[in-house]
């Protein structure tokens, strides 16, 4: 974790204990951080699992194995290594992951494919098997820790621990969620975009859990960007221990299914926002809302073209109401747009309507809005009913400083 805390940081929430999910931490020593860097979460037998993963074709062995093993639907453990991504490391990297899976599986007397592993850090450095083995051994013997301690342990360039919670009533039974996430740089929307872990005590069929997570992901994690770079290790996993005692949710027709899906979506959205708020060097949180598109998917792609534009992001960093850069980003998005119907605004003040600047446009309220930390950009394409909101942060000198020195 970085010593310099983001000005957009949020306090860590009070996360509930989740029956059947117990976190532990240990120090493997992947980097000379002087802190714990390995997280182990023990899961009750029968825990359902769902996941979404990066589509970066240079993904890590952790992602490859996780993507394959999530299909069997159940999990007994999660292990997260911080300080070494183990991506692009060939057979040695895969052997290191399989060794962790085998070690934990032997401890729990479960199949290795029910042990999920994630790693984060520098690409191209094999995970040291001896350090991993010792770290896992220490974690297996460690006393349980808090969710906040686990959240701190999975971080790399993160400046604050990130967590979210929610609850839902299912046929009179309260089910709870506790979630942690890490992410600060190399964040772009492509399935996941960081390492996120969601735990609930609800009883949920694995296929239904996957459907809910995939839907929530599309509307939350896939709508954020910090720097347009999609990591080789991106993973979001959801675990449902089934300990709450509710009637199992098997489809959207199950009583309480809508409430469960809504709570899961709320957790994912909160986590996604926290990642943006911890964007490397970020000073401002930006919400880009696009309306009037030919479809919601088209609106999302236009929004991301704006959110990924270095010129837009640096203008926001400089508190410059240069709405022409938004026009540029819309035009390059490759989506249906009509120059003569396009409208652009900041903070609820329209600067241009129907393809031209407003004659009575007053930049003063926009300039005042841009001095704040919470920025909104509004775009109306004037073509249809499609809408979407995406979230990003500004681009500052701090981002360059962090990434120029990342390996040192």
Name each region found by the language model.
Residues 2-81, 85-98, 105-408:
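A structural signal for small-residue-enriched, beta-sheet-centric alpha/beta enzyme cores
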